[in-house]
Amino acid sequence: RAVIEINGGCNYTCSMCPQTDPVTGKTGARGKNWLKKMPLDMFEDIVAECTEAGLNVVNLEGSGEPSLNRNLAEYIAIVKKYGAKAFCFSNGMRMKDDFMREVVDAGVDFYRFSIIGYTEELYKKWMNSPFFNLALSNMKAMNEYVAKSGSDATIASYHLVLDNDNIEYEVEQYKKIVEDAGVSTEIWKMHNWAGVYKPEYEREGKIKTCGRPFSPDLVIRAGGLDGKTGAVHPCCQVLGRDDEAVLGHFQDNTLSEIVSGDLYSQLREQHRTGNYPDFCKSCDFLIDDPETLVYTNHKRDLYKMHGTNFDLNDYR
């Protein structure tokens, strides 16, 4: 799987996301050098190179909002050209009308709406947006168009538990949204973004490698250091610590050079020994807590990456 971020920016300022500056409340806290749009030709070059290594799935969001790219359908078409599945994780605010239909018609395989909060008030609190009902109607309309057009796409929602002492109630509230729209879903406990965000609860369990440095999973950013593009990160959870976690740049190096290079090799050794780098050691993905995926109504395993055949448990 390749997570290729086609836009490093976001049009939301969610309170739990490192994209949001905790002082100003504005987006872009990861730094201007990470808020780029990936050029279409570079995107195709990366997809083509990853295809030679056995690419199955491309996620087009990374840690940004893919629908900010008005030509999103062109990126999806490139993924399909190379025989891979095209996945998008999004807030869904822009996914409507002709834009939505273009995305579906281009062949998107999986489109997930992030909806944090099950009422307008909670959505406004956590996602800092008044577009709760718009997101719901967009999701429902997209699912209806998928059925009408004969597309094989899966439309899904993603939710976070807001109060760990009230999980059963919150799951039931989220399920009302899901059942009304007729979509797939998954509900998770919050995580801490490699220690950047501190949720009100702490996960409990044995600490061991998350498995990502050893898995066939690659995270490529739209931006990079020193004005470069195509930076490679260990995973999306280093959002907010972007500068620290760079393992190479597709602008400068080939896929083989990056994954076999000194920085990636060092990261794997740190995960073997438990001497984790600063951008990993506070991450709650290192904690073996099987209760983080609270509910799902489709085939989504805790450690199985969407659309792939590998399981992170095999690398832990």
Where are the language model's segments positioned?
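Short, basic/aromatic recognition patches
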Residues: 198-214
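Processing junctions and N-termini across compartments
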Residues: 4, 8-11, 204, 274-277
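Short cysteine clusters
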Residues: 10, 14-17, 210, 235-236, ...
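C-terminal accessory region of radical SAM enzymes
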Residues: 140, 144-155, 176-203, 231-232, ...
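Short, well-ordered alpha-helical microsegments
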Residues: 69, 95-97, 120, 167-168, ...
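Conserved C-terminal portion of the radical SAM core fold
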Residues: 5, 53-61, 81-89, 104-119, ...
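Conserved alpha-helical substructure of the radical SAM core
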Residues: 1-110, 121, 125-126, 133, ...
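Active-site and channel-lining beta-strand-loop segments
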Residues: 215-239
